[in-house]
């Protein structure tokens, strides 16, 4: 595939910076037209990256990832076995694993999706019809379309964030959230002189 990419980069207007690693040992890497892969990124197939995407410096795209058209991935973000739908933006230093990020969602810097339970039990999902036992040891979350997540949001395994939801910085998503705006209440206490 590296040879294919090298032969068709100009034709498809794909920009691959120096020191990018495209590893097809485990599967093919497909990159769409007008996509830019920045310095130091690592992509391990099988991976599909759509057209008009930006993969930031030192991003790590791991096997099983599908990135749709018009997606922006920030500096040093790691994505594993996830679906990133069209026009989503994932900020710098995020970790997205075994999850779905829906169309036009925006994730600020250092957002984390947890994908396994500390008690090593399978991840379950709470749905309107009840709890679904997935049988999966690793399962991240679903982030609804046009949702906006602030810096350092953490999402626990199997959680669902409804479309058009806004989460302020440092919110920890411990349960499914209906559409709305959520933020932490913080109390600043001055101590000493």
Please report, for each region that a protein language model flagged, where it lies by residue:
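Short, functionally important structural connectors and interaction interfaces within domains
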Residues: 8, 41, 59, 69-71, ...
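Short, solvent-exposed loop/turn positions at domain surfaces
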Residues: 23-25, 43, 61, 95, ...
């Amino acid at each position: 595939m590296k040879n294919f990419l090298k032969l068709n980069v100009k034709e498809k207007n794909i920009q691959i910076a120096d020191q990018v690693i495209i590893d097809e040992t485990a599967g093919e890497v497909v990159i769409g037209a007008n996509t830019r892969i920045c310095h130091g990124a690592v992509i391990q197939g099988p991976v599909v990256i759509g057209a008009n995407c930006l993969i930031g410096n030192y991003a790590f795209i791991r096997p099983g990832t599908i990135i749709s058209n018009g997606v922006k991935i920030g500096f040093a973000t790691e994505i594993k076995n996830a679906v990133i739908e069209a026009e989503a933006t994932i900020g710098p230093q995020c970790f997205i694993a075994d999850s779905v990020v829906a169309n036009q969602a925006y994730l600020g810097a250092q957002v984390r999706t947890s994908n396994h339970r500390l008690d090593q039990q399978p991840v379950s999902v709470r749905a309107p019809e009840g709890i679904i036992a997935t049988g999966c040891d690793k399962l991240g979350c679903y982030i609804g379309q046009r949702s906006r997540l602030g810096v350092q949001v953490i999402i626990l395994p199997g959680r669902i964030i409804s479309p058009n939801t806004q989460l302020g910085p440092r919110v920890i998503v411990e349960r499914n959230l209906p559409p709305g705006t959520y933020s932490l209440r913080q109390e600043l206490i001055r101590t000493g002189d």
